Amino acid sequence: MPGIKVFGGTVLQGSVRVSGAKNATTKLLVASLLSDKRTILKNVPNIEDVQQTVDLCRALGAIVDWDKQAQVIDIHTPRILLSKVPPQFSCVNRIPILLLGALLRRCPYGIFVPILGGDAIGPRTLHFHLEGLKKLGAEIIVSDEGYWAAAPDGLIGAHITLPYPSVGATENLILASVGAQGRTIIKNAALEVEIIDLIVFLQKAGVEITTDNDKTIEIFGCQDFYSVEHSIIPDKIEAASFGMAAVVSQGRVFVEHARHEHMIPFLKALRSIGGGFSVQENGIEFFYDKPLKGGVLLETDVHPGFITDWQQPFAVLLSQAEGCSVIHETVHENRLGYLSGLAKMGAHCDLFHECLSAKSCRYSTGNHPHSAVIHGPTPLQATHLVIPDLRAGFAYVMAALIAEGGVSKIENTKMLDRGYTDWLGNLERLGAKILTEKTRCV
């Protein structure tokens, strides 16, 4: 689906069921490669990133049965058939880098991963991944073509302190530590709910692994694995995205299966600007309650802070909130470029290289525009936009739904297919009027 036309002035009403978490599903598929045992995953989202990961696992030797209607994947990998990841998988997303940690136990003489692709939100260095793997005893070679890792003598448990609680590095080191001899302790680890889901999965598989409140994870190497049946947690990013779309359109949407305990920082921020929500037994209802009030500081952070993937759609809310609000992006150094699209629609957005917060972040001395000031409320005008990345894509669709002046043309919507199950159908069922290039106007 290369492009869509979105009619403005839409009020979203109804209900939507949130899917399984993208950022959990893809990592659990990689984790299934740790052994030759059978894994059954339930509540699997039908999105492009999962399809790409399934195809990657199949290329490596996995036998996969994916019942998309039942949302169930049955996977087991008797043998690893390739030690070099085909380049077509590395250019799509960053999942293949986790194979360095996941496959060193089964392929000790070498795993090669080509240079990575993914969202255009900054370099996202792999230094933390590679240095951690070295501490476990891996040999690492970095070239212009990609990353090579080997552990011919096996991995040995170690004490690792991450300079920054990187989600990807934490996942990679957990997977590698499962195949190491002895005990590994990872300090300053990321503890996002998707990582906790990975830990729960590994415990079911027979791994001895625990966490502490001080961001410490302890793992004992495992040789005997069990088959696992596991239901994936709901996607907190998808849930928040539809919640924000409901509020900004001045509508009311019940997001089934949204978990309050996974979304506390988001719900706090939403309430701080006047957005309405009601936590119910099987989900959260989001609604427009009163005119939105800005004057807030939105600062992204690792768990338990306000996660970076909520930031872009939230900026659309701030463009409709009265007052001057500040966004301080501390996770990715180049995640505010999408604001040029909102500015094209009429939003008042100013970018800054400085940390516009009492707290300086790791980008304070770099030449990265990682802070923004948004003045609102500003009527948005329909225009032509090209989606730069997944979450910016949903932000653009939100903005187009409330735009004045007719129809917005949005291109590169395939980005949305990476992370939102049937996003177009869900929006249309909520009342959005969206035409694809294959849709004929009557």
UniProtKB/Swiss-Prot annotation:
The entry's phosphoenolpyruvate-binding residues are K22, N23
Q: What is the lineage of its organism?
A: Bacteria, Pseudomonadati, Chlamydiota, Chlamydiia, Chlamydiales
What's the protein called, per UniProt? UDP-N-acetylglucosamine 1-carboxyvinyltransferase
Q: Where along this sequence does the record place binding of UDP-N-acetyl-alpha-D-glucosamine?
A: R94, D309, V331
Say if the entry is tagged with keyword Cell division: yes
Gene3D superfamilies noted in UniProt: Enolpyruvate transferase domain
What's a single GO BP term from this record?
cell division
Organism for this UniProt entry: Chlamydia muridarum (strain MoPn / Nigg)
What's the encoding gene here? murA
Q: Which pathway is this protein engaged in?
A: Cell wall biogenesis; peptidoglycan biosynthesis
The task this protein performs is described as:
Cell wall formation. Adds enolpyruvyl to UDP-N-acetylglucosamine.
Give each disulfide bond as a residue pair. Answer: none
Keywords, in A-Z order? Cell cycle, Cell division, Cell shape, Cell wall biogenesis/degradation, Cytoplasm, Peptidoglycan synthesis, Transferase
EC number(s) per UniProt? Answer: 2.5.1.7
Q: State where the protein is found.
A: Cytoplasm
